[in-house]
Amino acid sequence: VERDENLQLRDFPTLTHVIGWVRDKTGATPVTMAGAATVSAPTAASSTAPKFVGDFAAVDELPRRVPLPAMRPSLTACVPTGVELGAGSRILVVLDEGGVGAALVKKLAKRGAEILAVEAATATDELLAQVAKWSTEQPLTGVYWLASLDDEGPLGELDLDSWREALRRRVVALHALFHQVIDAEPFLVTGSRLGGFHGHDADGATAPLGGAVVGFAKSYKRERPDVLVKAVDFPASRKTTALADVLVDETLADPGCVEIGRVDDQRWGVGLAEVPFPPVDSPEPGAMDLGTDSVFLITGAAGSIVSAITADLATHSGGTFHLLDLAPAPDPADADLQQYLADPNSLKTTIAEQIAARGEKPTPVLIEKELARFERLASALSAIDAVTSAGGTVHYHSVDLRDGEAVTAVVDQIREAHGRIDVLLHAGGLEISKGLAKKERAEFELVFGVKADGWFNLMKAAGDMPIGATVAFSSVAGRFGNPGQTDYAAANNLLCSIASGMRRTRPDTRAIALDWTAWAGIGMATRGSIPKIMEALGVQMLPPEAGIAWIRRELTSGPNRGEVVVAGRLGKMAEELDAAPGVDPEAFTEACAQAGPMVGRVVRASVNDGLVVSTTLDPKEQPFLNDHRGDRVTALLPAVMGIEGMVETARLLVPDWALAAVEDVDFLAPLKFYRDEPRTLTISALLHPDGEDLLAECRVEAERELPGSDTPTRTTHFTGRVRLARTQPAAQQADPPVREGAEVTSDDVYAAYFHGPAYQVVDVAWRDGDRSAAQFASDLPDNHAPSDQPTQAAPRLIELCFQAAGLWEIGRDGRMALPTHVTRAVVLPAAHEAVEGPLTVTAQRGSDGFDCTVTDGAGSVLVRLEGYRTIELPQPLPDDLQAPIRAVMAD
């Protein structure tokens, strides 16, 4: 829908006026349910083959990012926001019904602030009038919007009117208020009851309508980046004073994060983690099997992107499709439509002549408006033809998604014919980009309502009818906020929160919400200057081959559910809101000094990446570098010290938590220290809940300036996950290997290996049946400097595992290799305690790599390693160096 700068609120006194405006903008005419079109074969005249075809290979070239709770530092480690809550502050508090707002008013009054408290049920116009009168002498300093602390109750028990009223109280009135007071740029702190994790935990959102308020808040922050904006989420609770204290505290500290959750005194933001699809040929249990009996309901079906996705689903299923859109059913015999299909530009002349024949001036705006109508008709026809070409059946319904009765009639048809919906794809919506100061209430309600009311009407009509999966079109605007899109962001974040809540309310339905970035080659973002704007922002536009196939990949790869960001490079869209962001690095000085040799200083607490530390390492100072040279010349960071760095960083925020395991470690690229010069590396750890544990998504990265490049090249060298638990792992016992038979001496081992004294951890090795065994060398030189710093992941014991496995590979396969993966490493408390007798390791090869166990002389397990895999070096080990190892390890 094209922006109309002359649109005024007074022109839309009723919903009928709004619907009429949409139909006028899109060229749609009302079509009754009796007019639903059923098409069984494509027409010969329509050339509607999709321009792009979905491709799983293109999907897998992009990261699959999932929002998840990300632990934030305590407020004592955060910098002030700059907000003053005291004399001279004029603060509006929109109250909840549970008493939190009332407690907050008392606290603010004690601080000397002037307060205007308004009930959430207050009519919007009355709210605006009260604020206008109150702000005559002095503008607002800030707003506490607490209406979304109230639980709206089960959504299935609401009717359309109560649904709209619930959203009016929460977000429509919020927009109207900020449209009025935007020039004063008041701070905004909202409260919600999504569960304390903004719905990104395994349990799902509790009161999902609050998601609309959070989406609005994120976009307000993007429009006014210098203003404090916080969306504070809580679990269900009857507490009032404690929550009011939290709201005050969050107002005063940590300006670097909008989405804040509070659970058991712990602070959580929302970060992103990459969760890739499984291999195409190895879908996980719970994957959907699309076929000829599959039933699809798709809204927004006349959009070019949705049409292409429909074609992809149809081609790979041949099922039954119910396509819903405001646009009328396309007539393949329409001469103008056929002209558009043949040559869209030539139709402009025809349209101009038709406008002139009506006695109107054929302006470019009128011509483009009419051309857009034919674009939607062509997209609808393309979807219809794709379904029928695949042998499927298509029913096209021209329907306004805001019309509950019309939507119910369509869904009742499906219920009568099939009794179920396998895939409900809600893509209907429109976007009118306009800043808060210019966006009238009618525009906000229109953009918000098509998505929000459309979803409600669909699910209300479906009732308890089985639905296999729902897929809601969201956008990166909903995930990150976007200037000029407070309505679009609010609606999209609402759909994401509802999808999260369905884990509670409809556990048998896989509810998915996709945060799309701008598409390349197809859709509105390809027009005008948008591609150039995206390029300037560093945002990678979505390859259509990937976007078209993405939904099919989500459905058929496993039991995926929840919110997913579908994008390549996010650029400034996901840029931090604060340079620090929000955290005082000096608050971690003592913790860093006690952590170990791999943590230098805290750089920032990133919203997306978690806690980020930097460390400068020098091969001339650190034995673990000087004695670890891959070609006996260039120092390499040992893989085990990469693991150590991940563990040290992960425990900085929660030093009282114990290391339970290190999981899914990938050694992606060697970290080399060229010419023995120092290098600075960064380690990030994004901590999120995982059942009763905490799981840290970790990366080890470094930058290097290459000749001819203006900017440093950043490389991710290692990735992995650190699992933390409230208690230490339980002690384990295992029988140590029996030392007997032929042996490989330390001299023979390190004639083959490149390690120097500090990493010559094998004293002697031997074969123990179908596995290798080795004894740990005693009296090794220091691993690091200063030597009194602790290590947390027993790096040289894990190195013992690596080297024992490597000896088996040399002796059995004649291959020299480097680490590439560890599925799981467990360092038990005994590894840090006094041990009895010699330490030994066994390394046994299985289908998923080597499993290794390090024990002391009494059989206490110190380290367990699972799934250790390697990658062969390009240069083979000379035969004379292999021979003594092969003589012991080979049959």
What is each of the regions a protein language model found here?
Residues V1, P13-G20, A102, A207, ...:
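Phosphopantetheine-attachment site and its flanking helix in carrier
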Residues V1-P13, T26, F216, K221-V232, ...:
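Phosphopantetheinylated carrier protein domains
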Residues V1-T43, P874-D880:
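Phosphopantetheine-dependent thiolation modules in NRPS/PKS and related acyl-activating systems
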Residues E2-L7, S162, A442-E445, G478-G484, ...:
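Short beta-alpha connecting loops at secondary-structure transitions
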Residues E2-T16, L188, A202-T206, A301, ...:
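Glycine-rich loop motifs involved in handling phospho/adenylate chemistry
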Residues P63-P186, T241-V246, G256-S474, S529-I548, ...:
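NAD(P)H/NAD(P)+-dependent Rossmann-fold oxidoreductase cores
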Residues A102, E114, A123, T241-C257, ...:
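Acyl-thioester-processing domains in fatty-acid/polyketide/NRPS systems
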Residues R193-G204, P208-L247, V270, L326-P332, ...:
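Flexible, glycine-rich beta-alpha linker
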